[in-house]
Amino acid sequence: YDKNIATGTNVPHFFTSRRISGYQGYGFHVPTQDLHDAFDADDPRITYVFTQTGDRYKGDTEAQDNAESPSGYHDYKMTVPAVEKTGFDVWMISYNIRLIRYSDVLLMYAEVLNENGKPGLALPYLNDVRERARKTNPIDPRRDQQAYIPATTTNTLPDITETDQERLKEIIWKERRSELAMEG
């Protein structure tokens, strides 16, 4: 590792919340209570959007402390555990910045089909995203302590059957918010 060669990014340093274990961010990207409340309580994606006081990543010596977060949550997607920063300084962290995801393409296509009067054709694309989310492990393998584990059931994120164009538009927007939360 040579910090004089740009091999990483400093984005997590700016976006990560203040007082994250082993790392001080500027807190420019803090999830809100409104975003948290937009998720169904059993949605396993909650695990991969929010960190909460008491969460601890494997290899870290201290748990998350959300005392300085205005919402009480931190952004999971921008958190780089201390153990993954070995050999890096805060300005050159090895981190994958997601520019676009397949689920984003599926949701855009579902929205286009719905807006063009074909809500029935939009459903398979929307439900593909929900099916993948439904299969998400609610227990984060990167953490050895997890303060909140969604209680998933066989009824978690059921397929959408709504074909009313206006109602489906709202459903797609809500799905987009949950699926892509804290990205971009």
Task: List the model feature ranges, each with a label.
Residues 1-6, 41-184:
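Acidic/polar-rich alpha-helix caps and helix-coil junctions
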